[in-house]
């Protein structure tokens, strides 16, 4: 089975479900790090906010600005090279300037400085949750490796380079999605969920954003993410032609080595898909800038 190494973030073939590391080298490195951490008991934990640029992250930014959450020691966001243009427009046009007004710098960490953000490995392995047709005609979705590989592992390496020995990592998951909350597998990182702690739902986040007089942020995702709704795909196609062209090009690149793999669940090439947004998707899209 394919798994993500808990140390280096690389995908590997695990012979047993319990395996966490791709090699003895990674396993030994973790053991050595844990031994070193035991020597550092009592080390002050740095507060690190992982910003995603969307609704929940914007609500956290407002709570920080209003003094309802403390200023983090580090505010970080990874640039995986595939994020949508409208996300960066919001981050650079709203989030970063307003955070800088209170002395909080949102650090943008390029994934490419640490790891290859290509959607394909040299072997042809697809790193994103694309779709293919099974032997009996069913739709098969690939596992999701991109988030851990391009974001979490990169953030950890950046923090280590900054000399962070222990971290309290804030994640923007709201109270209505608390099932997504998890505990860290790393001894030096404690995952915290400030919105869950405060009982703030996504609807509450939208109210906070509106009440503060801010423009509502778009839903964040990569322009080539196969898990997008039809509404999101259609929005990209109609309003962000550069992102659309990149997604089409990425699919064609994948199909050079994997001709039966597609970015849309219909198993049809993107340029030929007839997108059919649901009423619920369209109502959600009305929360985002550009369609108001």
Region locations from a protein language model:
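Nucleotide-activated chemistry modules centered on ATP-dependent adenylation/adenylyltransferase
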Residues: 37-292
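BZIP DNA-binding basic region
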Residues: 1-37
């Amino acid at each position: 089975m394919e798994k993500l190494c808990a140390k280096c973030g690389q995908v590997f073939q695990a012979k047993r479900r319990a395996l966490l590391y791709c090699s003895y080298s990674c396993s030994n490195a973790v053991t050595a790090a844990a031994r070193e951490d035991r020597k550092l008991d009592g080390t002050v934990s740095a507060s690190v906010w992982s910003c995603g640029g969307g609704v929940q992250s914007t609500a956290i930014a407002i709570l920080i600005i209003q003094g309802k959450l403390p200023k983090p020691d580090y505010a970080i966001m990874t640039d995986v090279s595939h994020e949508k243009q409208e996300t960066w427009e919001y981050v650079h046009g709203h989030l970063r300037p307003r955070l800088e007004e209170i002395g909080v710098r949102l650090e943008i960490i390029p994934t490419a400085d640490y790891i290859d953000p290509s959607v394909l490995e040299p072997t042809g392995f697809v790193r994103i949750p694309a779709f293919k047709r099974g032997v009996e005609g069913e739709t098969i979705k690939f596992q999701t490796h991109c988030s851990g590989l391009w974001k979490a592992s990169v953030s950890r390496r950046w923090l280590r380079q900054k000399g962070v020995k222990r971290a309290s990592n804030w994640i923007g998951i709201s109270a209505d999605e608390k099932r997504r909350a998890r505990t860290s597998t790393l001894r030096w990182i404690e995952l915290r969920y400030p919105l869950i702690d405060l009982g703030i739902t996504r609807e509450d986040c939208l109210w906070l954003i509106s009440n503060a007089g801010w423009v509502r942020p778009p839903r964040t995702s990569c322009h080539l993410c196969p898990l997008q709704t039809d509404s999101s795909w259609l929005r990209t196609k109609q309003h962000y032609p550069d992102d659309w062209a990149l997604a089409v090009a990425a699919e064609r690149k994948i199909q050079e080595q994997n001709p039966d793999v597609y970015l849309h669940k219909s198993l049809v090439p993107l340029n030929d898909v007839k997108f059919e947004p649901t009423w619920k998707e369209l109502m959600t899209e009305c929360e985002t800038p550009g369609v108001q």
